[in-house]
């Protein structure tokens, strides 16, 4: 199987496991971008704890699911988004303004759209979850 996007594979396996009612899922291979994305999801309570397992290859991540994740996905290609354009992207990708987050990679690190708006930085859209 050809891997186009490691982040896409990780989010899709989490989404599928969540829909099947699983309590945990193993993601491999791992990357720094996946770990940062998971930290943002964990900060907002959409997943539980996760653990990085070093197998001296590409690594694995075991994620505890808590049943809050409805949908998550990757936006490819990674479109440039200015601070003023974030609102349009939230309207396009998320079901409502009250919940859900868009994850951006910015010059100040990987963060959700609300934190990017507070820090007044734009960046590239990585993905979303709600």
From Swiss-Prot:
Keywords: Cytoplasm, Ribonucleoprotein, Ribosomal protein. It is found in: Cytoplasm. It holds the Pfam family Ribosomal_S8. Coiled coil: none annotated. It comes from the Eukaryota. GO terms for biological process: translation. Transmembrane segments: none annotated. InterPro entries: Ribosomal_uS8, Ribosomal_uS8_CS, Ribosomal_uS8_sf. GO terms for cellular component: cytosolic ribosome; cytosolic small ribosomal subunit; plant-type cell wall; plant-type vacuole; plasmodesma. GO terms for molecular function: structural constituent of ribosome. Gene3D superfamilies: 3.30.1370.30, 3.30.1490.10. Belongs to the universal ribosomal protein uS8 family. This is Small ribosomal subunit protein uS8z/uS8w. It comes from Arabidopsis thaliana. The gene is RPS15AA.
